Amino acid sequence: MPSLVVSGIMERNGGFGELGCFGGSAKDRGLLEDERALQLALDQLCLLGLGEPPAPTAGEDGGGGGGGAPAQPAAPPQPAPPPPPAAPPAAPTAAPAAQTPQPPTAPKGASDAKLCALYKEAELRLKGSSNTTECVPVPTSEHVAEIVGRQGCKIKALRAKTNTYIKTPVRGEEPVFMVTGRREDVATARREIISAAEHFSMIRASRNKSGAAFGVAPALPGQVTIRVRVPYRVVGLVVGPKGATIKRIQQQTNTYIITPSRDRDPVFEITGAPGNVERAREEIETHIAVRTGKILEYNNENDFLAGSPDAAIDSRYSDAWRVHQPGCKPLSTFRQNSLGCIGECGVDSGFEAPRLGEQGGDFGYGGYLFPGYGVGKQDVYYGVAETSPPLWAGQENATPTSVLFSSASSSSSSSAKARAGPPGAHRSPATSAGPELAGLPRRPPGEPLQGFSKLGGGGLRSPGGGRDCMVCFESEVTAALVPCGHNLFCMECAVRICERTDPECPVCHITATQAIRIFS
């Protein structure tokens, strides 16, 4: 195709070339060749479709210059008359001079505009496909947790919605999200994150305004909020795997329980009706006692107690939100049976515990299972009534509470004290307990404790296949050591083991922390 165009140009301009050579100027011939080459390039661009056909120029209507012939095919039928001898040099010189700058201007500008449009379109496409990364900070790590959602459900939905990659900060880092994607997608994701953070801030602010000094205020009239303090090591035990235990307690008691965070005090906040709140507290205490083998000691740790000596903390609660009770139970789940066994035990209904005002023993050492332990050590176990008032003195109007021992001791305790050593080592039962305990006979194995005679009933049921204590080989097995759980001892021997300087189980040699009575 280019060869045909060149041949056509040469045929149209052949005669004019001869006339042009008449002037004998090599410079004019060079200009004509450059003009033809430029026109050839423009014709090729037109054939390729990258430009429009060039428009005819204004100077091509005149006397047939060599530059105007390709754009105007009718030029050859108008031959110029032979000029005079002096005029020919001026005409060819002026015609190329006037027509030389015109042909490249208009077609070249059109092709340049077309090429510029193509370049700009490619540049815009390149810019649109490029990714950018932007940091989106939020106020606190709590906002991060709220935006991410449970198991990342919210942040995954945001990634899919905005078609971006969002890197969430890990624990210990600054609360800053890294968003990567197209510029408009990144802007959309940024707006979504900031909106979610502001929404969470508003919710927390409204909650703090309506809340009490310690925690959330009741949502409905008649509801109360209490705080139950537990040891640090059992917070995870109460919460359970993936919160299963605390959810079960909430469902069973119809309450709302806020679990403590890692950087705060181990205090559970329970909100609900007064009766439901009390039941939830009981469930938490029972769960701790069953799983650890230890009873949750209050020791004024629980802000719910009305008798707390910490007036500063207690005064922060309004009287309207405090549940008033006649007395505090050491462990509320033990109310169902009077002998302190957890769950349903085969105990006669006659074993009804007296009121706390009738108990003569001290409730140290965990405050419940072993009365008298810690002050006077073995005195209560050997029948000596303590003169110190009980821990819950003044709460005689409390509900009947289960206790393990009464102030009256069994005859076997007295005989064991007599065999233990001379009267000078401890207070003698004959001299300090009164004459009514001096001549008590020794209790044979299997005989029920006489200490429960004041409570009524016929005595404990004898366990099947009664085993003897592996220490004294006289009394039946009625106690077990914690934490090993070996139930091979009578209660007296188990208590003696725990009273040693280095208490350990005779079977497994594990340190014993306490002894508990067992029932079959």
Curated annotation (Swiss-Prot):
It is found in: Cytoplasm; Nucleus; Cytoplasm, P-body. Keywords: Cytoplasm, Metal-binding, Nucleus, Phosphoprotein, Repeat, RNA-binding, Zinc, Zinc-finger. Highest levels found in fetal brain and testis. Detected also in thymus, salivary gland and uterus. Residues 132-193, 223-284 form the KH domain. Residues 73-91 have a biased composition (Pro residues). GO terms for cellular component: cytosol; nucleus; P-body. Residues 60-69 have a biased composition (Gly residues). SMART domains: KH, RING. Its main location: cytoplasm. RNA binding protein, may be involved in post-transcriptional regulatory mechanisms. Residues 49-111, 412-461 are annotated as: Disordered. It comes from Homo sapiens (Human). The keyword Repeat applies. Binds RNA through its KH domains. PROSITE patterns: KH_TYPE_1, ZF_RING_2. This is RNA-binding protein MEX3A. A zinc finger (RING-type) spans 469-509. The modification Phosphoserine is found at residues 338, 462. The gene is MEX3A. GO terms for molecular function: RNA binding; zinc ion binding. Transmembrane segments: none annotated.
